[in-house]
Every structure is written in C-alpha cells, then in structure tokens.
C-alpha cells in the first residue's frame, strides 16, 4: 500500500529536520511547478547561448524590453560597443561620434600596410575605431568597397526585418557599414528603409544581412539594381593632432 506524502512547495533550511516535517529541507537546481492541482519539484531547464557571436569588450549593462509590435529586444552595453539583439542577431548600434569628407588625405608607403590619414583636429585616440572608404585606390589600396547589386540581390523574409543581400566577394566584415542608393521596394519594405546606412552582419563571402525598420509583408527577391558603398572598420594605431594611422589588409604597391 502506498501513502501519498503531501509535501508543500518551498525549502526550509533554518529549522531542524524534526521541525521541518513535511517540507523540503535540501534541494539543488529545482523549481516547483503546479501539475494537476498539486505542486511538484521539477528539474530547472538548461541554458543555451543566445548567440554564437562574441562581444567586443566586457559587458557593463543589459536591458530587455518589447516594442509596440511585441518584438523581443535586448540591448547590451560593453566597454567597446553597444549592441541590440533583434531577430536572432546582435547588431552593433554604437553611435558614430563624427563624420567627415576628406580630399587627397590618404598617404601610403610602398610595401607597407600602414596608411596615414591627414585629418585636421580629428580628436581620435589610439584604439578608436573609424569607418573608411576611398573612391579611388591609393597605392593600390582601397579602404572600403563599392559596387552595384545585380537584380534580385535583395531578399526579404515574410515577417522579418532582416534583409539578405547577395553580392559575390563583397569584401565586408561583420560590423562594417554599408549604404545603399537607388534601391526599389521589395517584399513590402519601402525604398526609404533600404536606401540608408546599415550595420553589416556577414554570413559568408557572398552573403550579408542588414536590419531595417520595417518588417517584410512577403518573401521576395527584387529591389532593382542599387549601388552601394561599404565603409570598412579600422582601429586607429598611432595619432597626433592632425593625422592618424590604420593598418590595411595588404601592403601598398
């Protein structure tokens, strides 16, 4: 004959075993769950990584919320960047402090990958990040990328704010910036949401993702044949008041 023991939920750790009769006195990694009108001790579920992407810097703050469209969002601030987790990806949303257009201000040295940028009163410090693009190669070096997408290279997924961009050997890296121009609407995402500057998330050498403000209403591949300019991210290595240096991916010729 079996007798049911009516053990109530909760853990008592500061009484003797005798005084704690009918109560749990020692547990590990459990939770209490109501099943069939009774409370049962259940194993706490395991954990899994929210993303396989590593952060730059050390985490200093996290905030979770839902927007008016009931989209779950998480913002993470580190010593290096600010990220937002949206639709399965951590996007770098670190504000850009300042921007400038320079003319004939890039200096290179043959067989050297160090590039000097002449920028009066730039205000940068060693270790700062800059996003660069030069329209014309200097010493054989292009610090950014540019081109024109083939028709149908912008893909939408119904209900998603992520655009899939296909471009053979795009040359960009995650956290670089890309600006599109002359794109047309696709999958319910308007041209205005596409023709702006986006943070890049790289899938592979021929595919990248960008996040837009409007969710697609259908899955489609269109968008016309827009042009794009990609600003690649560099870390400042040496600075003085009016110049700074970065390291290119290859040596100048």
Predicted regions and their residues:
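N-terminal beta-propeller domains
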Residues: 1-99
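Small/polar beta-strand repeat architecture
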Residues: 14-19, 94-253
